[in-house]
UniProtKB/Swiss-Prot annotation:
Keyword list, A-Z: Membrane, Transmembrane, Transmembrane helix
Transmembrane feature ranges: 1-21, 106-126
Subcellular location field: Membrane
Organism for this UniProt entry: Saccharomyces cerevisiae (strain ATCC 204508 / S288c) (Baker's yeast)
Protein name as annotated: Putative uncharacterized protein YGR293C
GO (cellular component) term, any one: membrane
Membrane topology: Multi-pass membrane protein
Other remarks on this protein: Partially overlaps YGR294W.
Domain of life according to the entry: Eukaryota
Length: 153
């Protein structure tokens, strides 16, 4: 669905968690859709498109990653996001806001411990962003352990 010029500013929290699972559920309240468009073997980057939709998306497929170095996020609307990374311990590392439609951000993620032989999956949770409440690291750790649908806000 193409973004319209009259699209309102969207605030999101994007949480990245490293899992060995095959699919993930998104919150019912989310009016965004994320999908991987391609894996660039040259830069070892994953390209993700974040597009506004009129209907809530309930799930999407995961992308296999190996020796991931950076993540390129294509923003089709005003995005307010944080990203988290880690395997056993989740760390909050970046908070960024875009005011440019169609802007592309390359975010380095230090996954140097991942070898190309490993079959890993990057799980992406999309949550409605409340500027006064960011999910705590403890909540994210519990979410990662239980592999539940994100419903933190």
């Amino acid at each position: 669905m193409a973004a319209t010029p009259a699209a309102i500013e969207v605030s999101l929290t994007i949480v990245f968690v490293l899992f060995f699972s095959a699919d993930v559920s998104l919150t019912r309240n989310s009016e965004m859709k994320a999908h991987t468009s391609k894996m660039d073997s040259y830069s070892s980057s994953i390209y993700m498109n974040v597009l506004p939709t009129s209907l809530a998306q309930t799930s999407y497929h995961l992308a296999p990653i190996s020796h991931l170095k950076c993540l390129s996020v294509q923003c089709s609307s005003h995005i307010h996001y944080s990203y988290y990374y880690g395997a056993s311990v989740l760390e909050r590392c970046v908070f960024h806001r875009s005011r440019i439609r169609g802007a592309r951000f390359i975010v380095p993620i230090p996954f140097y411990c991942i070898s190309k032989a490993q079959e890993c999956f990057l799980t992406v949770y999309i949550l409605p962003k409340n500027p006064f409440r960011v999910p705590s690291e403890m909540q994210l750790q519990l979410l990662a352990k239980k592999k539940l649908k994100p419903n933190l806000l």
